[in-house]
């Protein structure tokens, strides 16, 4: 199975990665085209476009300016160790064994506004370019139009080469919209995580993001290769609810924390 996750806004380029192994992003040529567009933006353009403070806008101008596609471990970092959001807290990649990291390299893909699709050990340089950004480019007025079929084709090529029967979608709606799901050749499964609050089970963003990362970790640690094995996910008190689930959307519940 192939797993899809979102990137994170929070980045860590200070601490060293937990491995020296690395790879280079497949779609780097596309990234260069986007960088060329972004380098023409002023700090005020970026503040308006990305709805960020002047300070963050200035930081991103500097990042776009210094971005260099000749990635090395000295000027870039492996994606799974560079991202530091709720999903990545749940995954806790720093404690993965080398064997699990290599398994992740095969099974896990990170959707990205700038890089399109990243393998965990792909080197990347710091950036902020969310998939929902309305960035005018040569192919349209936003990043969904820029990426078009490119990400979907890359996913299909990967699942075909690896013989993956399932795609486990653990990405946010914003990022998964970059995938043309009707064109996917493997079976799509989108797990749902609900926490009990005030007597009702509901999707709570913070908990759901962390649960997505924990499910990635569970798949890697337990060599999960089937849906029967996937629904045994029980990290942090979650349990499978057959009553609420469908084949394509297994639901996992957790009592009030």
UniProtKB/Swiss-Prot annotation:
Protein origin, superkingdom: Bacteria
GO terms of biological process kind: response to hydroperoxide
InterPro entries in alphabetical order: YaaA
Cellular component, GO annotation: cytosol
Family according to the record: Belongs to the UPF0246 family.
HAMAP family for this protein: UPF0246 (MF_00652)
Protein name: UPF0246 protein swp_3736
Biological source species: Shewanella piezotolerans (strain WP3 / JCM 13877)
